[in-house]
Amino acid sequence: MTNNLSGYRNKFVRVKTSKKRTVSSSNWLRRQLNDPYVAKARIEGFRSRAAYKLLEIHEKFKIFTPNMKVVDLGAAPGGWSQVASKLIKATDGNLKNKIISVDLLEIEPIPGVESFQKDFFEKDTEELIIQALKGKADIVLSDMASNTIGHKATDHIRTLLLCEQAFEFALKVLNPSGHFIAKIFRGGAENELLNKVKREFSTVKHFKPSSSRKESTEIYLVALNRK
């Protein structure tokens, strides 16, 4: 698996106007059609371009090794779980290396991944994940994000709240020396959360993968080695 985009950059594709399509949906379609990571994901069999963000995080921080237990929050359609499954060499029925994936949306089956179509904020979801783990987790991943409304401050706060919930959950289930990786949007309100994370992990970094769109304020919180 590589993040090399050689051969995936095509000529610019224009999107014809349509009375049935809003301006925002036309802009989204144009962006998708001209995104080399979308093309690369389709050719290489990944379910979303987000797979390359996790690949970049791993390439820089070396977070995955074989025989790990991983929790993937906000997992649909499954791009991160696909990457994690390959990197830990997950197989169905192996209790030592497995991935637990959770999302409101259905996740099509992935080898070595146990998926739950659940709201992470429902009372029984945490217990469901803990029972499925049959022990502690080595990594908690969260690519959860609220539906954006185009108002940066609001989008920032909403996604930050999701990150805080994922962090509190990670503290409950992570092994000592475990890792926590989560998406946040820059906006200024994240400093309090960062201070909390730094008290619990030996190394805390911000990272923006090259596969993250330049215009996006998203970055990834990389917290390594739970104290």
UniProtKB/Swiss-Prot annotation:
GO cellular component, one term: cytoplasm
Enzyme class (EC, first level): transferase
InterPro entries according to UniProt: RNA_methyltr_RlmE (IPR050082), RNA_MeTrfase_FtsJ_dom (IPR002877), rRNA-MeTfrase_E (IPR015507), SAM-dependent_MTases_sf (IPR029063)
EC numbers, comma separated: 2.1.1.166
Pfam families assigned: FtsJ
UniProt-listed Gene3D superfamilies: Vaccinia Virus protein VP39
GO MF annotation terms: rRNA (uridine-2'-O-)-methyltransferase activity
Active-site residues annotated for this sequence: 183 (proton acceptor)
Highest taxon, organism lineage: Bacteria
Catalytic activity: uridine(2552) in 23S rRNA + S-adenosyl-L-methionine = 2'-O-methyluridine(2552) in 23S rRNA + S-adenosyl-L-homocysteine + H(+)
Sorted UniProt keywords: Cytoplasm, Methyltransferase, rRNA processing, S-adenosyl-L-methionine, Transferase
Record has Cytoplasm as a keyword: yes
Positions contributing to S-adenosyl-L-methionine binding: 78, 80, 103, 119, 143
Primary localization class, coarse: cytoplasm
Localization annotation: Cytoplasm
Function: Specifically methylates the uridine in position 2552 of 23S rRNA at the 2'-O position of the ribose in the fully assembled 50S ribosomal subunit.
Family: Belongs to the class I-like SAM-binding methyltransferase superfamily. RNA methyltransferase RlmE family.
Protein name, UniProt field: Ribosomal RNA large subunit methyltransferase E
Organism field: Rickettsia bellii (strain OSU 85-389)
Gene: rlmE
